[in-house]
Amino acid sequence: MSPPGGIGEAGAEDAGAAGSPVTGAGPPPEPAAGPPPEPAAGPSREPAAGPVAGLQPGPAGAEPWLVVIDMQRIFGEPGSGWLAPRFGEVVEPIGRLAEALAPRVIFTRFVAPAVPSGAWRRYYDLWPFALQPPDAPLYQLDPRVAGLAGATGPTLDATTFSKWGPDLAARVSGGGPLVLAGVSTDCCVLSTALAAADAGEQVWVAGDACAGVDDASHAKALDIMRLYGPLVEVMSTAEVIASAAARTR
């Protein structure tokens, strides 16, 4: 979840700078004798056909859990102050992930607190339309995903951007990687990924199954999460499905 402005206004440059390597002092080494090496092939733009190189398949039975973050009407309906413009485009890849990883699928919802406290008071002063109870229409799952969620049990609700906490940890206990999809990349997805990684979870972010407050913020958030590898891996939906299948062989 994210109000307009996204990560572009909140320190993406600082996060990138923190991950930059330090250049060593001293003169450059002498070039090696012999012909120059062949140039390395550039990265493919096509999704990988198999599991991502470097990811360990893991023991049989340690299947991933899919956590679909905040696919709610408040983020998907035109005219909403919190619309994620590409919300509709991620419904299809989320459906493929849910089919491949069922029944280990959890849908979350962002909901407002009954009485905001601390800095949240000012937040809801800026967004008063969102200060509604959890059963308000705007906080319900979007109809385009509600059918998927119906087979997965009750949603996991939280009044925080991050959905990682004791409730989610208990539901995925003993499982494999945590696969994240949903909205918004630059707020609730990012917050959940980093909190879960800090707790020692392996996190796979299905980048093409996430939508941001805008394209630039979406891309910056994915770049920031890549800095946290190997705890956090940004993958395509096809890569997630292939890597998940490899864990059960």
Question: Each PLM stretch: what is its role?
Answer:
Residues Q72-P78:
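Short acidic, Gly/Ser-rich segments with clustered Asp/Glu that frequently serve as metal-coordination loops
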Residues R73, A112, A211:
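Short, glycine/acidic-enriched loop or turn micro-motifs at the edges of active sites
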